[in-house]
Amino acid sequence: EIGSGLVGSEMCIRDSYYIQLGQRIGSQTFYDYFDAFGFTSRTGVDLPSETNFMQYYKADQLGEVQLASSAFGQAMAITPLQMCTAVAAAVNGGYLVTPHVVDKITDSNGNVIEEVGANVRRQVISASTSDAIRQIMEYEVGNGTGGGKYAYVSGYRIGGKSGTSEQLNMDRRTDGDYKKVASFAAVLPADDPEIIVYVMLDDPNNAKTDYSSLLAAPVVGNIISEVAPYLGIATDGEDRSGTTVTVPNLVGTEWSSAQVQLNIKGLKHQLAESESSQTAAAVTYQYPHAGAKVAYGTTVYLYTDTYEGQHTEVPDVTGKSADFARQMLSAAGLNCVVEGDANGTVQAQSEDAGASVQRGSIITITCG
């Protein structure tokens, strides 16, 4: 068969041309970097009973077959925390650091009693190499063609990489295939990472695919969509206030795929829970409906059962600040559009207090 020919680094990380890379650097160099990134020892996290079980080939055990399988992550057993510290080293300028649970301890007055500083264990790669890795990882998520696109969340610069491996030391599935581990690691902001989101799925049940980009990446994207605003992670700098988005048709789409489509468009999502709702099922109803023109950041309520449209009561937000009114409406399952002075107080609302409206409805508040 005809091969791919020469490929760039972005294509290499997307389609995993790692066996050739392993062959080129050789067994000793491969092991040296494997060790330098912390995969042969505990991370040193300040939690009790960190496991010391790690499975890997040492340099003198890496024959051609072992090197080939190790090069794409098939022949070793490591912990999720080891993976997180290694990814951090790859994108933070090249430094392997010891993870900590507590950043600092303060007294009741907010005075810092003890602060846990960064414990740099060693520099693994150069700053320039780390910068190149960040760019490649951002390309994987943001270019719209690789599997990393399923972790994309509009408004954020995200870098990421998927990983799929077989559990060779476990009993096989009933179909005779090996059990799989599907994972995805993301960092953001990609130009100056502050957080890592790592999701590892242990042989997902009832999955129609083994690809991590279709299994773990959407979960990462959904976590980012909730965590990034809460932590105040810097956005990509583009002002989207006043932007109008068209709601896509999600009926018949699997729940996980629906979430991805909304993340890409800059819309939030909420599963309208009932006794029979299932996150693994397909969407049967949505509100706002497909084709609706809504503000960037609007929440779309999705249903995975036959119940069409839960209702909620509109709270009285008159006299409240715009921010507090927005919070009250959100807590009631409603979207909010602010007209007038966004720093003022609510003078009027488009739906009367106490009215019963469909969950996900847009309430316009006029502030002054």
Predicted regions mapped to residue ranges:
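Beta-lactam-recognizing serine transpeptidase/beta-lactamase-like catalytic domain environment
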Residues: 4, 10, 14-198
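Ligand-recognition elements built from short beta-strands and adjacent flexible loops
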Residues: 55, 116, 152-155, 169, ...
